[in-house]
Amino acid sequence: MNFMVLPPEVNSARIYAGAGPAPMLAAAVAWDGLAAELGMAAASFSLLISGLTAGPGSAWQGPAAAAMAAAAAPYLSWLNAATARAEGAAAGAKAAAAVYEAARAATAHPALVAANRNQLLSLVLSNLFGQNLPAIAATEASYEQLWAQDVAAMVGYHGGASTVASQLTPWQQLLSVLPPVVTAAPAGAVGVPAALAIPALGVENIGVGNFLGIGNIGNNNVGSGNTGDYNFGIGNIGNANLGNGNIGNANLGSGNAGFFNFGNGNDGNTNFGSGNAGFLNIGSGNEGSGNLGFGNAGDDNTGWGNSGDTNTGGFNSGDLNTGIGSPVTQGVANSGFGNTGTGHSGFFNSGNSGSGFQNLGNGSSGFGNASDTSSGFQNAGTALTRASSTWADSPRAWPIRAPSRLQVWRTRATTARECSIRVIISRVSSTGAPPQKKVGNSG
């Protein structure tokens, strides 16, 4: 697995997980102790051989004594070489711990990476009109910087660790200085696998290649109490887990159960976040599959507190709802806020296929309608289009106002003109000619 293509969530979590440099420093102390013991044994053995063979009055005389001294010389050389190897292993462990501490200090903290991702999620969920696009771009740029920072730290860590490893000499080469009678395996050791020659730097480990830990069962584990292969951390059960207390395979974080989970306390497969149960959830506290957000229960929900399938928004109960729903009732295909029923758009509607505000029937549009297919305001019947049919449909309910003086004057003038026209018409009918217009002054 190439760490250069891994996101900062993986690299940061890996470098910060586990027991840290403490086990490596403890191994360095142990190697120092072993080197001291081997050095004391070599000095004591050399002094003893010298006392037996040196001078004419020594205890060992003759050809047999010379042969014994020659046979003891390789063991003295082996003790001196083993002392040097143990001192080198102690120095290598200290150098490895220093390289790790430098890499950890140069790596972005997992909390900083998680804060960046949470900020991006918040900006995306609230980006209804595109107002958060500059902030989203800035957050992504910061994420790229975190990625580059982690890659640079891991490159330095890889180079330092490789240098330390190249300076170590395999212990198998040291056995070549011993006589054949010692290097030959006893009869009871026939069939022992050669892989057991791989050193395991730890205590009470069972397996091959377990480093820097205690009580690992399996192969190539780093940490303590791991069961399986290639685990890094403490108390993992499975394979390729990075963190603490994971059960399954390839989990990154702590307390995960399943496969390919990233975060903490996830139960299932391929969850990103914390406390998710199911598959392909992103966020926290989701239960189901394909949820994006917080506290969703169901499948393919986006938002928070949704219960059902394919809801977008918050507190929707049912399926295919968009907006903010009622947390205590169930609806289907609603858009808006607080709707209960099916196919509503608007606010606080109950029934089916309504649009507007606080309609109680089916197919109503407007405000406060309590019947079906009504449009307007506060209708109580069916298929009404006026406002407030409870009083507007009754003629007796309309208010009666007294006529004004202008209305009275207009009425009287109209009546006078009508009377004059009637007199003229009656005269024409009786004489056959219109009345003559008088000329001159009228008295």
Swiss-Prot record:
Where does the record place the region 4 X 10 AA approximate repeats? 231-270
Q: Name one GO cellular component term.
A: plasma membrane
Disulfide bond residue pairs: none
Stretches that traverse the bilayer: 15-35, 38-58, 59-79, 181-201
Q: What InterPro entries would the database entry show? A: Mycobac_pentapep, PPE_dom, PPE_sf
Task: Specify where it is mainly localized.
Answer: membrane
Q: According to Swiss-Prot or TrEMBL, what is its membrane topology?
A: Multi-pass membrane protein
Q: Which domain of life is it from?
A: Bacteria
What's a Pfam family this protein contains?
Pentapeptide_2
Identify the keywords attached in UniProt to this record, alphabetized.
Answer: Cell membrane, Membrane, Repeat, Transmembrane, Transmembrane helix
Q: Does the keyword Lipid metabolism apply?
A: no
Which Gene Ontology BP terms does the record give?
biological process involved in interaction with host; response to host immune response
**Keyword Repressor, does the record have it?**
no
Indicate where this protein resides in the cell. Answer: Cell membrane
Gene3D superfamilies according to UniProt: PPE superfamily
What family, per the record? Belongs to the mycobacterial PPE family.
Q: What is this protein called?
A: Uncharacterized PPE family protein PPE13
In which organism is this protein found? Mycobacterium tuberculosis (strain ATCC 25618 / H37Rv)
Its lineage reads:
Bacteria, Bacillati, Actinomycetota, Actinomycetes, Mycobacteriales
